[in-house]
C-alpha cells in the first residue's frame, strides 16, 4: 500500500535508477480546484518494453499491463481504444465514480499515446 516498501527494518535504499525512455508522455485529468490528477497516465516506450503507469484511479500507482501488451503489438491509440480496466478497486468520491475513473484511464492513455507518435 501507500508508504510501504519491501525493505526490512535494517535495510536502506542507496540508489534508484530509471531507464531513459525512448519516448514518453503523461496526461492527466485534473481536479478543477486542486489541479491534482483525478486520473493521470504515463505511457513510455523503454528499452525493456512499453510501460503504462496510472495514478489517481486506485489507492496507489499501478501498471496497466493489458494496455502495455496491446501497445507492444501496435503502438497506436486505436490499439487500446476498446480496452477496459476492472474498476471495482478504483477510488470513488465526489469528483469521480470508480467507473468514470476507469473510463478516464483509457482516455488519458490514448491521449498520451497520440502525443508521442
Question: At which residue positions do the language-model features occur?
Answer:
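C-terminal structural segment of proteins
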Residues: 1-117
Amino acid at each position: 500500500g501507500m508508504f510501504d516498501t519491501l525493505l526490512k527494518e535494517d535495510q536502506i535504499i542507496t540508489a534508484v535508477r530509471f531507464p531513459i525512455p525512448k519516448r514518453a508522455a503523461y496526461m492527466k485529468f485534473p481536479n478543477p480546484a486542486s489541479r491534482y490528477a483525478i486520473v493521470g497516465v504515463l505511457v513510455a516506450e523503454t528499452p525493456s518494453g512499453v510501460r503504462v503507469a496510472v495514478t489517481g484511479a486506485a489507492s496507489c500507482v499501478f501498471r496497466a499491463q493489458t494496455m502495455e501488451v496491446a501497445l507492444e503489438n501496435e503502438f497506436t491509440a486505436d490499439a487500446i481504444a476498446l480496452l477496459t480496466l476492472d474498476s471495482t478497486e478504483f477510488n470513488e468520491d465526489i469528483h469521480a465514480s470508480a467507473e468514470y475513473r476507469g473510463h478516464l484511464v483509457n482516455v488519458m492513455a490514448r491521449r498520451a499515446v497520440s502525443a508521442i507518435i
